[in-house]
A protein has these predicted regions:
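Acidic, glycine-enriched catalytic cores built around paired aspartates
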Residues: 2-310
């Protein structure tokens, strides 16, 4: 229901690079249950109750002097953004530089809404135990599409998630609007967490933070390329050119050096063109209206120009 809000709570410029790579979970929100809980869920869906549970067994070390070591009933699936690991769920999308306060606010509010909905049903129930079983089965039936125990990095999962109707929000700029949807305003307003104005102000601040971060990165890249990389390459091409001339004067074959010179000169030309493009779009971005318009320009124009130069 609130996958877009969870994704937004973990959004920052650095996470745009991290999610889906570098030992990080993908940007698609799903839940990994593992074999043990998955077995319980399947029992509940098929019969309405769980009568047994899998266990992890013992670790066979082959050393008789060591005591028995119990194994987890499941692995930890590092490709899942929301995974059950032994006795808890882990929300792994938050970047290392970010505070967990924001994601905790979102998680706790979503859980509060779920508890409130359950209470509305159970408080009116004539038979509490029967109502609990029915409610659990209903929730699992309605939301089992978010359960995925496979490889979250695979292209197959991206296609499968699309079939299931799960959002794949790839960037911070595309995630921020989740804060100000009618659904989000109703959720946070119901529990007096944030007003509509407070959500809008937070969205505006996030847009500005994104724009500032990308602007700093772009200017740093321009500075590095213009003052360090290109001058170093120019110096090296001069050395290669001198070498080619010297080898030819000596009557030897200079084809290897000449080929290297041609390749590097070509790359230097491409680098200079990419640098000029980045300089132009960065300057253009500075003139855009601050907030959503500017941050979207940074994401869809400046970031690709940075990738081109990189």
């Amino acid at each position: 229901v609130h996958a877009d809000l969870l994704r937004e709570s973990a959004a920052d410029p650095g996470n745009d690079h991290r999610l889906g790579a570098n030992e990080a979970p993908p940007a698609i929100i799903s839940i990994f249950l593992g074999e043990q809980l998955q077995d319980v869920v399947e029992q509940l869906l098929s019969t309405g109750e769980a009568t047994h549970s899998l266990n992890g067994g013992k670790l066979q070390t082959g050393v008789t002097t060591l005591p028995d070591l119990t194994k987890d009933a499941t692995d930890r699936n590092r490709t899942s953004p929301f995974a059950f690991t032994g006795n808890k769920f882990e929300f792994r999308m938050v970047g290392s530089r970010d505070s967990i306060a924001g994601p905790n606010v979102v998680l706790n509010t979503i859980v509060a809404e779920a508890f409130a909905e359950a209470c509305d049903v159970l408080e009116k129930a004539d038979d509490f135990d029967t109502a609990v079983h029915s409610l659990i089965k209903e929730y699992l039936t309605d939301h089992q599409r978010i359960i995925f125990n496979g490889n979250g990095y695979s292209d197959e999962w991206v296609a499968e998630a699309e079939k299931r109707g799960l959002p794949n929000i790839k960037s911070m700029v595309e995630a921020i609007p989740a804060l100000t949807t009618d659904k989000a305003v109703e959720l946070f307003g119901k529990f007096s967490v944030f007003t509509k104005a407070e959500l809008e102000s937070r969205a505006e601040i996030k847009y500005e933070n994104y724009a500032k971060a990308i602007n700093i990165e772009a200017k740093a890249m321009i500075d590095i390329a213009a003052k360090q990389i290109i001058p170093a390459v120019v110096k090296y091409t001069k050395e290669l050119a001198d070498t080619v001339l010297a080898v030819k004067e000596a009557g030897a074959d200079a084809s290897v050096q000449a080929e290297m010179l041609a390749d590097i000169s070509g790359l230097l030309t491409e680098t200079k063109a990419a640098l000029k493009k980045l300089e132009a779009v960065t300057e253009e971005a500075a003139g855009k209206e601050e907030g959503k318009v500017q941050s979207e320009f940074y994401h869809f124009s400046v970031v690709p120009a940075m990738e081109g130069l990189r």
